[in-house]
């Protein structure tokens, strides 16, 4: 097991937590600049680690909250950055609605590779409590978020996030600026929840998207026929595969379907 030491604090890097610590302060400042933070913003940092991004955020926002699961790192941040409120907890278990009681959150963070998708879906579920997200993640996942119809990266994650948020790929981050060095590069992505009201059954829509991509090589007809009445569909050729449809076409198709009784 690798160990990382910084300012007399040593931790055994937990691979299962996806702990790779950003070391380049110029990259951290670029992330903060991209987020366009203001002094009074309600910032929530996910997994501050040894505080590289924390330092850059504090240059703009003097007081904010950070969530850190690792006990040693949480204590380090408390001691090193007294103005940062540290919640020692698994981010996936935190109540974002409660944290947003004084204003919508600006989410920042270098999120762990191992739980990137669960974090993204938690943020999606809580998007009404969020003003913006500026997140660093595995480059491959970032590409999937902004993928276009017809590409191999286009799938459930792209459709669901692009339906409810404006997603922008900002810039790539080389693996050499992390300790320990990961096997892949990273990228920074901006996610801004849309303010428009979703005029359909959101849970039903998200289940429909998952079902549409159930088996990628199958047509929409074959993926959907067990679960929906397809007789009213007129807008989409159901011989197509899900990866061919735009977000708008998914919405149109969903409104033409009727779930079959259990």
UniProtKB/Swiss-Prot annotation:
Binding site for S-adenosyl-L-methionine: 20, 22, 47, 68, 90, 110
Alphabetized GO MF terms: 16S rRNA (adenine(1518)-N(6)/adenine(1519)-N(6))-dimethyltransferase activity; RNA binding
Alphabetical list of SUPFAM superfamilies matching this protein: S-adenosyl-L-methionine-dependent methyltransferases
Residues spanning the signal sequence: none
Catalytically driven reaction(s): adenosine(1518)/adenosine(1519) in 16S rRNA + 4 S-adenosyl-L-methionine = N(6)-dimethyladenosine(1518)/N(6)-dimethyladenosine(1519) in 16S rRNA + 4 S-adenosyl-L-homocysteine + 4 H(+)
Keywords: Cytoplasm, Methyltransferase, RNA-binding, rRNA processing, S-adenosyl-L-methionine, Transferase
EC nos: 2.1.1.182
Alphabetical list of Pfam families matching this protein: RrnaAD
Entry's localization field: Cytoplasm
GO cellular component: cytosol
Predominant location category: cytoplasm
Top-rank taxon: Bacteria
Function comment: Specifically dimethylates two adjacent adenosines (A1518 and A1519) in the loop of a conserved hairpin near the 3'-end of 16S rRNA in the 30S particle. May play a critical role in biogenesis of 30S subunits.
Family (UniProt): Belongs to the class I-like SAM-binding methyltransferase superfamily. rRNA adenine N(6)-methyltransferase family. RsmA subfamily.
Protein name from the UniProt record: Ribosomal RNA small subunit methyltransferase A
């Amino acid at each position: 097991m690798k160990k990382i030491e910084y300012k007399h604090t040593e931790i055994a890097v937990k691979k299962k937590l996806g702990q790779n610590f950003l070391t380049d302060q110029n990259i951290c400042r670029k992330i903060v600049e991209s987020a366009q933070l203001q002094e009074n913003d309600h910032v929530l940092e996910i997994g501050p680690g040894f505080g590289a991004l924390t330092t850059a955020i504090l240059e703009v926002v003097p007081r904010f909250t950070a969530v850190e699961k690792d006990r040693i790192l949480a204590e380090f941040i408390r001691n090193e950055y007294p103005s940062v409120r540290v919640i020692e907890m698994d981010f996936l278990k935190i109540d974002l609605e409660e944290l947003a009681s004084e204003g919508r959150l600006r989410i920042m963070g270098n999120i762990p590779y191992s739980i990137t998708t669960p974090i993204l879906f938690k943020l999606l579920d809580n998007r009404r409590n969020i003003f913006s997200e500026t997140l660093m993640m595995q480059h491959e996942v970032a590409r999937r978020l902004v993928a276009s119809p017809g590409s191999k990266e286009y799938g459930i994650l792209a459709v669901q996030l692009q339906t409810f948020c404006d997603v922008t790929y900002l810039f790539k981050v080389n693996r050499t600026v992390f300790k320990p060095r990961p096997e892949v590069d990273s990228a920074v992505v901006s996610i801004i929840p849309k303010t428009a009201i979703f005029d359909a059954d959101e849970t039903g829509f998200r289940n429909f998207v998952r079902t549409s991509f159930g088996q990628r090589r199958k047509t929409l007809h074959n993926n959907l026929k067990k679960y929906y009445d397809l007789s009213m569909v007129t807008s989409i050729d159901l011989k197509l595969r899900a990866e061919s449809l735009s977000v708008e076409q998914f919405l149109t198709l969903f409104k033409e379907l009727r779930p079959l009784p259990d």
